[in-house]
């Protein structure tokens, strides 16, 4: 996975699978370093794994990240509030996607399963809208 940056873009476009695998490596390293010692269940040592404590932890983290998206763009709050930090909003949206990958990993799903589920759901919506 070569992804050198040139300004704000990557030379290599990562697939969903590449991103999921990279995040899986990050989570594996966090387990090895003991970063989740208060949250992981006994026997949690490799991802993906179905671990309700870590899944729950990441759902709570997702709620925090969603709040940060809303904080970066306050235009939703009322029509007078003009706070909008586009770069910060994009970074927080990326954090949300990363945390969603963690939720999937700690629910026992791999990248292929998640990608297939997303594609299936998107196609269902597309077909439903096409038939309206």
Please state what every model-predicted region is.
Residues 1-132:
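Flexible "arm" and connector segments at domain edges
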